[in-house]
Amino acid sequence: MADPDVLTEVPAALKRLAKYVIRGFYGIEHALALDILIRNPCVKEEDMLELLKFDRKQLRSVLNNLKGDKFIKCRMRVETAADGKTTRHNYYFINYRTLVNVVKYKLDHMRRRIETDERDSTNRASFKCPVCSSTFTDLEANQLFDPMTGTFRCTFCHTEVEEDESAMPKKDARTLLARFNEQIEPIYALLRETEDVNLAYEILEPEPTEIPALKQSKDHAATTAGAASLAGGHHREAWATKGPSYEDLYTQNVVINMDDHEDLHRASLEGKSAKERPIWLRESTVQGAYSSEDMKEGGIDMDAFQEHEEGRAGPDDNEEVMRALLIHEKKTSSAMAGSVGAAAPVTTANGSDSESETSESDDDSPPRPAAVAVHKREEDEEEDDEFEEVADDPIVMVAGRPFSYSEVSQRPELVAQMTPEEKEAYIAMGQRMFEDLFE
């Protein structure tokens, strides 16, 4: 059961006391801030900014001044918003018990200071020597009096002293104390009236409350914003959440493609249109390098040359098939070379017989097709051998199993499976291939 002497509402005398004190000894900004706290038990700092329209720095200076003088108290609370973000807010309120004690202390301190000034003014020096600047009080008048001349003379230089007007109090201290008591009498009356007031704990330490005026303005602003968003259409939905989003701040998408680089290069070239061939590919820029007859006889096939160049630009996917075909072609060329070697003496004999003929018959006779065919086969065989030497891929051992050098280069996991001896052989083979390439 609650104590009947405990008040659950702040008496009007306490509110008037706070208003009198704040208006009598502080500025208008302090009075406005305290008026809000008198009307509302506990107010958030942001709400006070909204009501007073002060700058945040100015408002905090005013509140810190009042808090330093123990007129108000501050309480910090951590609040969680709807989006899960936590913020700290300062709530200010008046502890009326502390306010009464502070007012009593400050008034008593002022009264004591006035009494001290009164006591000091009665004991100040009232006589001063114009020569040696010695000062004397009223209690030393018997020492200064000279009965022969009937004057007050200095005890050091025997010069007649003068009354020290600068040491005289400008105002009577007893008058100041009387005026102080007269002006502070309304505050004294309120203090006597609130002497035995006992306030409940929820009044001394109030909980935060919402200001009705601010609530109405916020509801009206929310309604207006909702209507504006509906009228604006769907393009305003992107601005619905103004808070920053950090979901994708530390997310990195890495795509690892295990396909061959040749496929990627070919895919990138598919969407591009074929460019016109430059003049040095379409025809020779060297005068007399190739004759028209050689072009017609098939000595140089420009279309085949173009296809070969395009084939070099994009590597062949069927490398294994081409390797098998080249090996088969080599075997065929070797068999044909054996048959040509058997017919070579006959050709040589025919050539020696033809030497006895005249030069005129040599010019008129057509070229022998057998010799041309043999010469062409030899050239083709040499070209095939050179191409095969270039096309042959060295064999590398990986954990005792044979693999081609190109396959190991494209699959780094095979290198990890090598023994130290196999890895040294693999590195040495790569160095030799690199040296052969630039020799």
Curated annotation (Swiss-Prot):
The modification N6-acetyllysine is found at residue 67. SUPFAM superfamilies: Zinc beta-ribbon. Disulfide bonds: none annotated. Residues 333-392 are annotated as: Disordered. It holds the Pfam family TFIIE_alpha. Residues 14-104 form the HTH TFE/IIEalpha-type domain. A zinc finger (C4-type) spans 129-157. The modification N-acetylalanine is found at residue 2. GO terms for biological process: transcription initiation at RNA polymerase II promoter. Recruits TFIIH to the initiation complex and stimulates the RNA polymerase II C-terminal domain kinase and DNA-dependent ATPase activities of TFIIH. Both TFIIH and TFIIE are required for promoter clearance by RNA polymerase. This is General transcription factor IIE subunit 1. The gene is GTF2E1.
